[in-house]
């Protein structure tokens, strides 16, 4: 595929930053798949101690606890007041974040991570061990970007079709209720 490099060469890990007084907090339950589904407003003075990773647009967040769940995301928001839990490794990509996210979601990569995890009930990897894992990446930055864009577009299509499916399922359920309002199931004895 290209060059074998460590993750530490692909991204800056856990960049230092000063937290804002009020921020939107993303904990480990907030990300499902590659989507941020929820967040909550916190103040710096009363926030959980794990609220430490100030997000910047384009940052990739990798769930270091139970990484087999593949709840990792790219932060696409322009706002500068979002903070993630230290349960995520924060990767600030050297090149294309979507390409890195695609690699992180790859089952072979997950196996490499699990081999380096500690703990059995809640396997976890620390950011330094994650940064030391070697990956093969294209030398050409444009190729990385095209690969990342390709998989981002596929993910968008999947999401769109999932929403259509969910909507049609609700329509079907409503129509069945309307067409058969008093249908009673009769059990034979």
Report each predicted region and the residues it spans.
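Feature detects amphipathic, helix-rich regulatory segments
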Residues: 1-189
